[in-house]
Amino acid sequence: MAKIVTLDLQNPDVLPVWQRLLQTLGLQNFTPAEVAHLDFTLGLYEDQQLVATASAAGNVIQYVGVDNEDQVSGSRFNTIISAVTNRLFQKQIFHIFVFTKPQYSRSFQHVGFHELTRSPQAAFLETGTPDVHDYLAQIPDFPAEVGATIAGIVMNANPFTWGHRYLIEQALQASDAVYVFVVNTDASLFTTAERQQLVEAGTADLKKVIVVNGGDYMVSYATFPAYFLPSTEATIQYQTTLDAQIFRDIIAPACHIKVRFVGTEPLSKTTGIYNQVLAEILPPQVALKVIDRKKDDQNHYVTATQVRQQIAAGQLDDLASLVPPSTYQFIQRHAQELHQRIQKGQQIHGN
């Protein structure tokens, strides 16, 4: 008799059974960080044997595995995916994503998922609402004239610096209008709402700039599961490929974006890989323009990482040369809270 149960992966008797099933299906990476990120894991048992499993982290389904040695694998897949989506519904999560191997995409489509994009290594699908069409519908339109050049920029802005402002200004000089998409993941020192607020405040005087929340479609490193990929660098490259394809095929056409601007990345290997993949994926539909990073008076690159490091060190006096007044004032008002976040373990390095 088939039964769905919640699997406690902290239980030393349960974890190896779960891992063995997934390993037989080609999933090998079970880092503590990946497993700890899961909100819950379900298992389908038949005759006391684990024959299917699926997990969820936030609104992303992960670690899906189904024993397909017999002819009931389709039924098992439907059962476990129905169970995990119903559990998410109970948690008031009605918009659900899955990253999976491309060969499993059709199975997810049979149970109501829609494929957003795929690469040779991974497919990205969604189900529920608000979906990608709802996201696109809420993006403001530019009343652009025929032949106008509309540009796009995607930034984390953690926080918004003079470097970010410089990139936007350079895009404006070469374009008729600019969309600035703020990455929508609360995995940074500054929350998503704070980062978007600072970008809006720091560009308030710039006409023909629209600041937009990136939603769930500027795919985040924080939500992309690495368990079926061979290495960290491969994870970045494959995730970025999906991200670039979504921008090229979905976001850019809806917003009439013809060119995307990025800054050079002499200091960040991760973002350097990101820019390289963008250059391979975006053209010819979307041109890529790379702008040299802004430097300060001492000929040092202006980076958000440096700003965060100075916040951590309590060195706020020098920040005025790195960030616009609106960002500087925000940091001064919230310095204690930001410092508390750092003390609680919020990372300040990286992008």
State the predicted function of each range.
Residues 1-32:
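Short amphipathic alpha-helix that is part of the acyltransferase structural core
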Residues 10-12, 44, 71, 77, ...:
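Catalytic cores of nucleotide-enabled group-transfer and carboxylate-activating enzymes in metabolic
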Residues 38-52:
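Conserved beta-hairpin
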Residues 39, 61, 148:
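Short coil/loop residues immediately preceding or within conserved phosphate-binding loops
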Residues 55-56, 86-91:
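Beta-strand-enriched, solvent-exposed domains that form extended recognition/catalytic surfaces
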Residues 57-72, 153:
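Conserved acetyl-CoA binding element of GNAT-fold acetyltransferases
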Residues 72-88, 110, 164-169:
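Conserved acetyl-CoA-binding loop-helix of GNAT-fold acetyltransferases
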